[in-house]
Amino acid sequence: MARYIGPKAKLSRREGTDLFLKSARRSLADKCKLDSKPGQHGRTSGARTSDYGTQLREKQKVKRIYGVLERQFRRYFAEADRRKGNTGENLLQLLESRLDNVVYRMGFGSTRAEARQLVSHKAITVNGIVANIPSQQVKAGDVISIREKAKKQARIVEALSLAEQGGMPSWVAVDAKKFEGTFKQVPERADIAGDINESLIVELYSR
């Protein structure tokens, strides 16, 4: 599956907010002007962004945050729309329940991209079974563990140390000494951090 491999900071500048693609603990705000579009001096425009443009930008932002491409994102939205309740909230819950995201939220990877790589390289088990599909949906009660051979990887140890200092989400329980965590429950909307306006995405797909 094709993925963006260019400068991560450029994507955050394009969206005007830190997407935390380089680190979950260190903001880019001190390193670059997030309110300035990519380009030598930042692209400017006097034209007002249309409603469609605003909705499209929000969708692009969420896709980049979670590292999901268009076709897969559409499938997530279709599933969210089929489920009972708020479609936008359902969408975010599906994205947050991805295995790569849960590995990231538990602090085993410093970014979602790094967490995705750990999953793809078979460094992760779910309930004792090796899992290598980043998009696998994690269920309440599932136990996520780092495989024995990967526990000494410096990047995992460092990421977990930083995550412990910053605090874990309330919907995961992590035993750092065991390199293991439990997905306690699907997070409620209030538990999902991030500058996201999911209603704009619902409006976009409802056109």
Curated annotation (Swiss-Prot):
Cystine crosslinks: none
Quaternary assembly: Part of the 30S ribosomal subunit. Contacts protein S5. The interaction surface between S4 and S5 is involved in control of translational fidelity.
- The segment annotated Disordered runs over 31-55
**Which organism is this entry from?**
Burkholderia thailandensis (strain ATCC 700388 / DSM 13276 / CCUG 48851 / CIP 106301 / E264)
UniProt superkingdom? Bacteria
Which stretches does UniProt call biased (Polar residues)?
A: 42-53
Q: Which InterPro entries match?
A: Ribosomal_uS4 (IPR022801), Ribosomal_uS4_bac-type (IPR005709), Ribosomal_uS4_CS (IPR018079), Ribosomal_uS4_N (IPR001912), S4_RNA-bd (IPR002942), S4_RNA-bd_sf (IPR036986)
What broad taxonomic lineage does this protein's source fall under? Answer: Bacteria, Pseudomonadati, Pseudomonadota, Betaproteobacteria, Burkholderiales
Q: What is this protein called?
A: Small ribosomal subunit protein uS4
Q: Which family does it belong to?
A: Belongs to the universal ribosomal protein uS4 family.
User: What is this protein for, i.e. what is its function?
Assistant: One of the primary rRNA binding proteins, it binds directly to 16S rRNA where it nucleates assembly of the body of the 30S subunit.
Q: Might you report a single GO cellular component term? A: small ribosomal subunit
Q: Name one GO biological process term.
A: translation
Keyword GTP-binding: yes or no? no
